[in-house]
């Protein structure tokens, strides 16, 4: 089975966290993320996808050191037209300032209130939010 890797950023606002960003697909909400290109690093991929999908630049956000959430699952890949084993890597990023979100690849976006536990999508979104909550509590 083909192995693929995608990377993205869980974007949060304020300290302490007040809200987090999700992008609207046709039938679901998701994090800004995408596939690794060439020989880029995971962080380079995550930052590139964040810029492409939201307009958030590297200067707008701080990736919090020590947070790197990973999950793996099988997916029917539209990109490759076959079932693939996907590794997803998510970084936690805190905005440094207010920014205008420009959803270039999605229908819309929304800032969801930070009110754990979250019930959005069990496989990835809820799990990464729970891990981010634990990380933020222990790294105040």
How should each PLM-predicted stretch be described?
Residues 16-57:
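Conserved Nudix-box catalytic region and its N-terminal flanking loop in Nudix hydrolases
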Residues 1-19:
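Conserved N-terminal beta-strand and adjoining loop/helix that marks the start
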Residues 11-15, 25, 93-95:
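Active-site beta-strand termini and strand-to-loop segments that position acidic
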Residues 30, 85, 111:
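Short aromatic/basic micro-patch
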Residues 90-94, 99-132:
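NUDIX/MutT-family hydrolases
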Residues 4-6, 26, 83-88:
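Short connector loops at helix/strand junctions that flank enzyme active sites
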Residues 56-98:
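Active-site segment of metal-dependent pyrophosphate-handling enzymes
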